[in-house]
Swiss-Prot record:
Function according to Swiss-Prot or TrEMBL: E3 ubiquitin-protein ligase that mediates ubiquitination of TP73. Acts to stabilize TP73 and enhance activation of transcription by TP73. Involved in the regulation of mitotic metaphase/anaphase transition.
Name of the protein this chain belongs to: E3 ubiquitin-protein ligase HECW2
Pathway the protein acts in: Protein modification; protein ubiquitination
Catalytic activity: S-ubiquitinyl-[E2 ubiquitin-conjugating enzyme]-L-cysteine + [acceptor protein]-L-lysine = [E2 ubiquitin-conjugating enzyme]-L-cysteine + N(6)-ubiquitinyl-[acceptor protein]-L-lysine
Recorded name of the encoding gene: Hecw2
A GO molecular function held by the record: ubiquitin-protein transferase activity
Taxonomy of the source species: Eukaryota, Metazoa, Chordata, Craniata, Vertebrata
Amino acid sequence: MASSAREHLLFVRRRNPQMRYTLSPENLQSLAAQNSMPENMALQRANSDTDLVTSESRSSLTASMYEYTLGQAQNLIIFWDIKEEVDPSDWIGLYHIDENSPANFWDSKNRGVTGTQKGQIVWRIEPGPYFMEPEIKICFKYYHGISGALRATTPCITVKNPAVMMGAEGMEGGASGSLHSRKLVSFTLSDLRAVGLKKGMFFNPDPYLKMSIQPGKKSSFPTCAHHGQERRSTIISNTTNPIWHREKYSFFALLTDVLEIEIKDKFAKSRPIIKRFLGKLTIPVQRLLERQAGDQMLSYNLGRRLPADHVSGYLQFKVEVTSSAHEDASPEAVGTILGVHTVNGDLGSPSDEEDMPGSHHDSTICANGPVSEDSVADGTPKHSFRTSSTLEIDTEDLISTSSRNSPPRGRQDSLNDYLDAIEHNGPARPGAASSSERSMGASPKLRSSFPTDTRLNAMLHIDSDEEDHEFQQDLGYPSSLEEEGGLIMCSRASRIDDGSLTSQTKPEDDNPVENEDASIHETASLEERLENLPEVADGSLPSSTAPDENEANLEPQPSADQGSTELCSSQEVDQPTSGADAGASDTSGGSRRAASETESLDQGSEPSQVSSETEPSDPARTESVSEASTRPEGESDPEGADSSCNESVTTQLSSVETRCSSLESARFPETPAFSSQEEEDGACAAEPTSSGPAEGSQESVCTPSSLPAVQVPSREEEGSAAEAAALSEQGELGEVWQRRGSLEGAAAAAPAAAATDSQPQEDGDAGDAQGACEGATAQEEGATGGSQTNGHQPLRSLPSVRQDVSRYQRVDEALPPNWEARIDSHGRIFYVDHVNRTTTWQRPTAPPAPQVLQRSNSIQQMEQLNRRYQSIRRTMTNERPEENTSAIDGAGEEADFHQASADFRRENVLPHSTSRSRLTLLLQSPPVKFLISPEFFTVLHSNPSAYRMFTNNTCLKHMITKVRRDTHHFERYQHNRDLVGFLNMFANKQLELPRGWEMKHDHQGKAFFVDHNSRTTTFIDPRLPLQSSRPTSALVHRQHLTRQRSHSAGEVGEDSRHAGPPVLPRPSSTFNTVSRPQYQDMVPVAYNDKIVAFLRQPNILEILQERQPDLARNHSLREKIQFIRTEGTPGLVRLSSDADLVMLLSLFEEEIMSYVPPHALLHPSYCQSPRGSPVSSPQNSPGTQRANARAPAPYKRDFEAKLRNFYRKLETKGYGQGPGKLKLIIRRDHLLEDAFNQIMGYSRKDLQRNKLYVTFVGEEGLDYSGPSREFFFLVSRELFNPYYGLFEYSANDTYTVQISPMSAFVDNHHEWFRFSGRILGLALIHQYLLDAFFTRPFYKALLRILCDLSDLEYLDEEFHQSLQWMKDNDIHDILDLTFTVNEEVFGQITERELKPGGANIPVTEKNKKEYIERMVKWRIERGVVQQTESLVRGFYEVVDARLVSVFDARELELVIAGTAEIDLNDWRNNTEYRGGYHDNHIVIRWFWAAVERFNNEQRLRLLQFVTGTSSIPYEGFASLRGSNGPRRFCVEKWGKITALPRAHTCFNRLDLPPYPSFSMLYEKLLTAVEETSTFGLE
């Protein structure tokens, strides 16, 4: 029997002798046959490498044991050691030992973005459809995701199933009797169309179809002459939704054959297509003929071949049978032929998981677990659970809904022979309604954490199995049983179609209750049930058991065998038994399965897509996608489980519609379902398919879909109205679909499950882990079930990390259409606009108002790109004080000066939210003002107890340093006990409380303070010193107190404009000395230079010790002073955040300011303010103050020399000199696509040598550098846009970006990073600046410089803080650490050693430095090593590494991105005038007044409008470049006063008409800057 079953399970193929590292089957069988030998002797020879001599150089895959018994407690552990290249898309598959095809895996796991070349995971094997024999031999194989190459294979592993009785003969008896029709059938496919095909990052495919007829997979099916028929469609250009008009394809086939359809992308030399495969269907001809019904359109979701494939979309077509084989076949054969296909799920909708190679076909598959023959004979499943179902069954609908569900293709192929045997075993019952038969089958399970979305695979893969396991235990389910089910049972109310089946269903049967009682009270043991599994026949529903309009509420009998009952029932399909519908209200099943419904957050089981027939006439009938199952740790997700949902036939009372599990099903009647990211989100989008008349039922077929969210807008975009309608429907529903996503409500749901009356909405709320269907952006911890939508369109739900989701409050208000909320890898919520392809940190509250002006696509794009980085504040100065500070009483000019840019981003677009205003007020509170005051350290010195606390408490020092650097940190630290105690030491209890403050006492008598201004409470006493208003000039004081900051350092906040390259010395007015307003004019020395000069005095230590006697004993501080004396300004920059040094220097403020170096007069250049050290008068308004630079300027003369030398060498080596041209013809609306195609098409030599020439299509302007500059501006804003998934925002701010670990899941990502590197290189050699902001480690990576601990702060601030604390403190007996880190690999949290044997090496005070270095390396490189290598490779394809190596990271940042700060004085001083204008002309004065009134973003846009880029060179406006070298900003008197100003970007010239009034000039200039963006010829 076992061998017979084995024969039906799969036909044995000989293994490919070229398969690497694998023992041959003969050897493996001989090893297994040596039963007489001791077991360990066989194990000694087990090795995955046939070359035992040099195995160290080969990849290996091994297992912890080679005999595994199902159900045993011991885990099977798989170890890998891969010597070749690895990739995040690598996967390990479980195969039968004789399987050669990579696609025929039984289970698989994807690696994910972390993981290394060595590791291990636990693999739990459960009794299932593949292990129906006493012994089965399997192996595991490791495949490289990108190339598909087999890396390693385990030796043979024998899996024993003690539950299967050796003598089971159920299959044999029936199998021999099956007859197959040998008559050919002719059919025609027409009206073929595909919807939502996968596209490249920016390219639409050119799809075509390959169709062929192949023999059925079973070995008994013959290969005939007609096999191999192949048809090819025409190629449809540039579309993801091809329609093959007027094309028909005819085929001849046996009923046992399969039709294979593959969609491919036409090969195009002009663009790099790495994978041309777009999706595949393998449809049994029988199923196809069953589903064809007149003119109705069949719809099948496309499947994939391997877990690493990216597939989306579905295929639709009509089938017309031109000649049928049925009349010549015997009745028995016809019954078998037709009956076989009512098995749950249509093979034609292959799982997204498995698009099969051409040689593998499938037959039918059972879905949930077989039901024994005797129970079928009664018309009830043997292990029924409590059900309630009423009404007549629409058999035709059974066919359609049955075929909607797609079992997994591929891994089920090797199962198909077994299933075929099942199908043909049971004799077809005469008179049976074959179209309503429901055969039960087990469904294979897979876990795949591989996202298939091609554009936004950007989120987290955190394993949540442990929590799922806990939920199951909490609910009292044995976790092992939870796995068995495989399928989610969905109820479906079928509409009655009298014409289709009247003769096949008997209207009544009075015995359903007795039948079911009998079946339910059977308590067969687990072994009996497993033994009976193979005996399942098709389960025809006899006409004698057609359901009556009665209700049967049957309680399963509790018994000691409850566990086994659960096992089997979870495998059962809800059979349309007499009066009972298990799917509608399966209480025992429902409660048992509830916990297993919710897809673990990031597992990402790749579901088989639910194929859908669409009849456009019915807008109400929809499908929604179901939750998948949650499993205990290490378990495979039921891929098949998710894929083929059983529909129980729940018929309907008149036109009452079955309640959809979530409201969105009613909401999106037209949208083809493309949800995405179920891997990360566990969320499901609706899959609506209209079909049937308007009264038709809705069905809830729930399975996470993995298609990209390319949504067709719904007619019902008014979410609230649709929701109200859906809610009102809820009360009238006759059939309740129990949401199994329920974790909390699962147990409670059981008693009420049988109700056929209306059920309250809370049933959905309890069951729906996402909450209601409104745009739920929060997910409840522990569950992410259910479909989710935001009321407008199915969007991806928050890909949240389960541990963190509780931090985000639930948001019930729907997002506007085409918006989606997400959480980035730092736990911050951001919003994605899918229409404009932008991201924003602010929640969009309503659909945008229609534009008043009709803007061109390019200007809309420019504005969106500007918003994408949240109004990048490179000029970090706020608007004029009167605009910003008037809102707060008594705040003086300083009110908003410490606001971070985030508070004012998009100030002209959206109003501030209440929380934002509250934050604004908080940041202006007395504690913040005190901490950031320039006098803070002076006051600190005068308070000995506070000073002692400050110096002794490193945490306190760290917090104060952070707050002084960026006031936003105060919100985080404000309730810290140390900080509160410290600040209260300065409070003056005698003073009145500030206005709006009130003191209260808690129940313990402790005083606390209420700030009614910001509606906050605090223990910090607001009566702190330094609250008096100060002159405006004081606001630019703090450069010497805080660290030098840069964009790459991720530190540019509003407050950071004080911290840039030296701004202004602290005004002397803050000291009680004579004011020196003209001091800067007399000695224009940058403040840092003054400090260095002061410290370089010969007797400096004596001078310092006079005021700071402790200096003599503080060797560390003395070393720092010596370091600054030696290194100069760069050394001071490095130490600028050192609190001890800052305090020391603050004592000598006056001396430093008054100190004039003796050689200053001899070297005038020493006294000149460098470009990075602007000097402006304290009388200037804050709006005109020089803002922070992107990076602190290095020592100017040295850097300028490097830069000149660099460009000179580029010129001598012929970089970018021609004579050839690098012609780029760019369409604005296809900017990246055109740029990628053309730049990647050039050779390395062409890129280096040729002169760049950019033309925008439709704009006849010549490129005298203006279009080139704009090209780099636009391409950098698009390419580094986090929307596309290549880059992500850094941890510290909302606009600097870094390489995203999730970019590994973007199609062709290595080529895109190469392209990014080439763009960086081209910008460098052609001397253009990029409008992009990167973190410091990015520039270090470009220079191949190792990162250190300080660089980590820009990636992960808290992680850096922890390591910094560890570095600064003695960790002896405090921390219990080893040289290991935890990573998620193949869906499991695994421990990775930072060094060999690291798990056994404790971290001590002696080796902590090495530990910190290794942790920094691991954290910075985590998930981005290969991407970084690709980018660096592209960069050095354009630029010689030796040329760039002269720069450090900070200098390279300046060369690539410029300082992009606007100094109005510098701008005005370096502007030329023509046509009669001069500096004192009234129009010019108005012009500069208008520029001064502009906010920072508008100034940048003006600069971009005139010069083509909003960045300016390091040297300032004097070094602006035009078409043929340096060309200053120019304003020319030209044009009519009715016209707008005009720009000539090639010459940096603005044509400004002589407007008669300031208001007209301001309005026209603003309009020109914000509304225009094209090039033209005069």
